[in-house]
Design a protein with these regions (language model features):
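A basic- and aromatic-enriched beta-loop-alpha substructure that forms the phosphate/nucleotide-
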Residues: 25-68
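Hydrophobic alpha-helical transmembrane segments
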Residues: 73-83, 237-238
């Protein structure tokens, strides 16, 4: 499923632009934005070894806490079915734009496109900062050194422990708003996509935070004896 995450929305949104024969400026913009999003994510996933058999470090931990049959059910219904369905849902603003091609691309669309690109740039910077830090730490350990910091706390990570997640979610809200602009309504049924995506990232972040707090007592600024007794602070999400 991880391998499909950066590809499926590109296909879905691109198909709506193709169905309009690439004559609709709004759909073309949406397709290009999602293509740029997919290219960034694919590159980042590939350099981490995602296409070479490397596994997200969280999956073994999750499997260890379940019986085999429980994980198989989780894999089928949540990872495969639900997440594939979610990728369809977050792409549906393009369907709204497709159904309302009569409305012209306007200043609001341009503002949202620029906002999406700003968020994409932010996520790219956050990913690169994390990559540079992790690679530097690996080289230092391989040379027999001891890293001064065990996790990143500068750059964008000075303001949030997960700036890449923050920017990622906001991009799909921006795409949703572009769809809204095509119909002239701020609220529509396709809001379910970014809402469910936000909830998915909140759940994923909480799980990641628990693992990090267990591994690094100083993570989050909590003393070791308090781990497990405090809720996650807002810095996990604050931009």
């Amino acid at each position: 499923m991880d391998r499909m995450w950066s590809i499926a929305p590109v296909i879905y949104v691109g198909e709506f632009a193709r169905a309009a024969h690439f004559h609709n400026a709004r759909l073309n913009a949406m397709a290009l934005l999602v293509l740029a999003w997919g290219a960034r994510l694919t590159f980042n996933f590939a350099r981490k070894g995602g296409y070479s058999g490397a596994e997200d470090y969280r999956w073994p931990v999750l499997r260890a806490g379940m019986k085999n049959w429980q994980f198989q059910l989780f894999n089928i219904f949540f990872i495969v079915l639900y997440q594939n369905f979610l990728l369809v849902l977050i792409s549906l603003p393009a369907l709204t734009a497709y159904r309302h091609q009569g409305t012209a691309f306007d200043g609001w669309d341009l503002l949202l496109v620029l906002g999406f690109l700003f968020l994409l740039l932010g996520e790219t910077v956050a990913d690169q900062q994390q990559w540079n830090f992790q690679e530097g730490k690996k080289k230092l350990i391989a040379a027999g050194g001891v890293p001064e910091k065990r996790f990143l706390t500068n750059g964008l990570f000075k303001y949030s422990r997960h700036p890449n997640y923050f920017f990622e979610i906001k991009q799909w809200w921006a795409l949703y708003l572009i769809g809204c602009n095509s119909i002239g309504l701020l609220f529509q049924r396709t809001i379910i996509g970014p809402v469910l995506l936000t909830l998915l990232f909140i759940g994923s972040t909480r799980f990641t935070e628990k693992l990090s707090l267990a591994k690094y007592p100083e993570y989050g600024g909590l003393p070791e004896e308090h781990i497990g007794h405090h809720s996650l602070d807002r810095k996990a999400w604050r931009p």
